[in-house]
């Protein structure tokens, strides 16, 4: 017996997407959630993405809805854990995402929607691929667990710091939980974010019933819960797993009676690691300065001998002493500072979750360190003379 799942036809996909436009959706995502270079060769990927965008565009054309309609390129996780949690390289992930982005842009999408990301580093790779290949708007949505954190530990505040630092146009949460379970996550986004906050919850929690997956929240309750979060300040709302067009229709109707809350500039100074954010301005912040060769002969020796273990040991000592940030300076005239700072950033974030302060006057080294950093780093020693910050 052939148990291979039947692939949907273009007509079936168009019908489904049209039903969401008919329900009042402004944005419908292309059928490309799992489309990436790890699963398809370049020719297959281009054909798949091009067809998916064409189908969504046709669904918008056929829809009876009179609202503005947009097609978003849907990008989901690669399905690989990046180092240090897994064995996949960060730059390889950027390259894989870039392929999908390029094909989607060429096919004529209106925006890019990165969603259901459960790892901050994977999220950064996807957003970097978008930013390096298009000027289209990009929305970024992460999948949080019941503990209010991503699978690899990031808090909403940490994601706000990093994603705003990379100029995402809207940020928020989707999948994994229903709207009531995501209230705490959404409130943290609203506390820190200066860009629109988005929300696409599941239709509650799934369970198996007669061999099928069903959900425990129905359209009236769903729209009521989402409506309360719209009143708190969420500006973009939709649905994820289990949300049929009836759910979207209910949310659209509910939103008509709600006055949108203005998006406000929070004027916060945040830095972050892959787990948490640190806010400046309320109380003194303790920054460890031991990872610095100035006046430290033993540290200088470690740099010359490529002794990364000594540097990691200094980081852990300072963490145990209670510092909140780690300054990282590996500048010596005789070493390759860009290469060593890149290595130091990678190795440090594998052993500590303290945010890093990258300390260098070399713009090439700074760029390498910031690119590899899993969070939003603090920048030190860059001055305003000439073009010292031209690459930052």
For every predicted segment, state its role.
Residues 1-392:
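Domain-level signal for soluble alpha/beta catalytic cores
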